[in-house]
Amino acid sequence: MKTLFFFLTIAVLVSSCTSNIMTKSILEGKTQFSIPSLSSTIDPAYEHIGHFPDDMKIIFCQQCAFHCIEKKKNIPHCENSICRCTLENIL
């Protein structure tokens, strides 16, 4: 009986530690991203942004599409910095 209790206690501890380690590694994987280096061809007026306005629209639309896909919705259009997802689900 003591052996069974000891084994179950060890199993719970190992499971808990494994869960914590996996959660930390998943969070670290999500926060790691590459930051594009600033090019010397960027207009100094846009240097604080790091992208041209057209690039910002593309990035916004990519983030909008990702957001809609996470919600399992379609993206009908992406204009004027407004992100709208459709009401119907992706098939």
UniProtKB/Swiss-Prot annotation:
Protein name per Swiss-Prot or TrEMBL: Putative defensin-like protein 221
Protein family according to the UniProt entry: Belongs to the DEFL family.
GO biological process: defense response to fungus; killing of cells of another organism
Subcellular location: Secreted
Cysteines paired by S-S bonds: 61-78, 64-83, 68-85
An example Gene Ontology CC term for this record: extracellular region
Source species taxonomy: Eukaryota, Viridiplantae, Streptophyta, Embryophyta, Tracheophyta
UniProt keyword list: Antimicrobial, Disulfide bond, Fungicide, Plant defense, Secreted, Signal
Leader peptide range in chain numbering: 1-19
